[in-house]
Amino acid sequence: MDEQEPVHIPIEDSIDLHSFAPRDVVAVVDDYLHAAREAGFTDVRLIHGRGTGAQRAAVQRLLREHALVERYWDAPESRLGATVVRLRRPHP
């Protein structure tokens, strides 16, 4: 079996987490935050949806302790369906 080359997906200032399994969301967000900072973003939006609130809670639990996160807040226009994250600036 031939190995396929990885698909390059450009990093944008938001990620929609609806297509990821709940068990994978924390790892996906962690990887995304590292890639977003490397790409030079200061603020990013994590779209987790409203639903039961479980995914939002899991995401915000990670953000509370994450070394790259300066602060985060509920995106005002999303009615609790998205979280905005301010990333720490890299040290020179």
Predicted regions located by residue number:
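Long, charged, low-complexity intrinsically disordered regions
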Residues: M1-P92
